[in-house]
Amino acid sequence: PSQSHYNVESHWVFLLNGLHNFQKLHGIDAISVTTHGASIALLDDMGNLVAPILDYEHTGPDEIEVEYNNIRPLFSETGSPRLPMGLNVGAQLYWMFSKNRELKAKTASIVTYPQYWGHRLTGVAATDLTSLGCHTDLWDPYSRKISSLAEKLGVSAKIANTISSHDILGVILPEIAYQTGIDPDTPVYCGIHDSNASLLPHVINQPGSFSVVSSGTWVI
């Protein structure tokens, strides 16, 4: 492919090796995946990728900045700021569809990045609220529904079912249980956006109202 993208098969081998080693050393009784919120996976009706998972630092979406700005929802609808490159997932989709006119028709379902790995572990496709609500332009948090952008892009019916991070996607697939030594009844949770994951302990443990001053995703 001509665009910058993730080597998901190498990541998959790394993940399986990590699960195998962790199971051997400590044991695993549940799995949840957390990632950044600026990538998305397009799957066909067999659950396979129909396009590479775009690196959010790829500048391709900047090529259609004016056109995209004309269709993206207002901040008052989504709470998403307008960000450069592929940091708005909606811009990624718009750019990818403009580059490949057949891509939308090939796409059966769209999943957020943590849930792509959850899908590979379980075979179940979903999106989660924290990832879809993370500056994607695709989520209306006030109405708790897909934003108007999805309809404009013609993907409302393609975005996989949106569930909570604590919901269970399913159990690991038998072949993964065999490869890793993990119990085949091990649940895989939906997964969560990384910055929301770092906020969650405060939400759970802090009584009453509070403020968190965060550096964002990365801390050095």
Q: What name fits each language-model region?
A:
Residues 22, 60, 70-74:
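Conserved FAD-binding subdomain of flavin-dependent enzymes
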Residues 35, 57, 166:
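Residues that line or immediately flank small-molecule/substrate-binding pockets and catalytic motifs
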Residues 12-20, 90-93, 193-200:
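Short, hydrophobic/amphipathic alpha-helical packing segments
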Residues 40-45, 49-68, 107, 111-146, ...:
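Glycine-rich phosphate-binding loop of actin/hexokinase-like ATP-binding domains
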Residues 1-52, 106, 161, 177-190:
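N-terminal glycine/serine-rich phosphate-binding loop of ATP-dependent small-molecule kinases
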Residues 76-193:
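Gly/Ser/Thr-rich active-site cleft segment
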Residues 31, 58, 96:
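Residue-level signal for inorganic ion chemistry
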